[in-house]
Amino acid sequence: HLHQYPLKIWFFCVQPSLQGGETPIVDCRQMYQLLDAKLREKFEQKQLMYVRNYTEGLDVSWQDFFHTSDKAVVENYCREASIHFEWRKNNGLRTCKICPAISQHPKTGEMVFFNQLQLHHVSCLDPATRKSLLSMFGEENLPRNVYYGDGSPIEDSVMAEIQAIYREASISFPWQQGDVLMLDNMLVAHSRNPYIGARKIVVAMGEMFQKEIVTQDMEG
């Protein structure tokens, strides 16, 4: 959901876990093809709105995320990236950013389902964590969430369909010490399976790409 991101990502296995810890990968071109045509069209038209609430003591602070404690620097960054921002009580910050759910790869021209729905949607939390966060903060104040670009909620049924497609299309392998994995970050999505025992996978990213900024009809 940032206005720039790496096109290349590398993984190096320093120490594989005793059990689990795979890095499942999914072809984002295949995800695009497997999506229901009506749902794909809906995402293309509506896009996505990522909402972040930076609250002291909960998840990441805005100071750590933006690497500054200067509010003016944060505000300038948000304006340049077309991110709506709102300073809240107790030194909190709320941001909203509209991004595509579906993109065209800048080099291959292929259409890809490229987004961070799984990372941000509240339905992807485990049920106990979701219930606890909603009871404490309410949906509006969750640390992170994602909606359709018009602000309407993305249905849990839609997220369940997307998760099922990810599971169907995913490929995983057991890490071995010394393994190197290089991915095109737009063509291939990745995740991480739970694991037992010590595990160390180091990651490097490069070839930063700045996407076209989507102008929002908001003030901030």
Regions found by a protein language model. Give the residues of each.
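Active-site environment of non-heme Fe oxygenases that use a 2-His-1-carboxylate facial triad
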Residues: 4-220
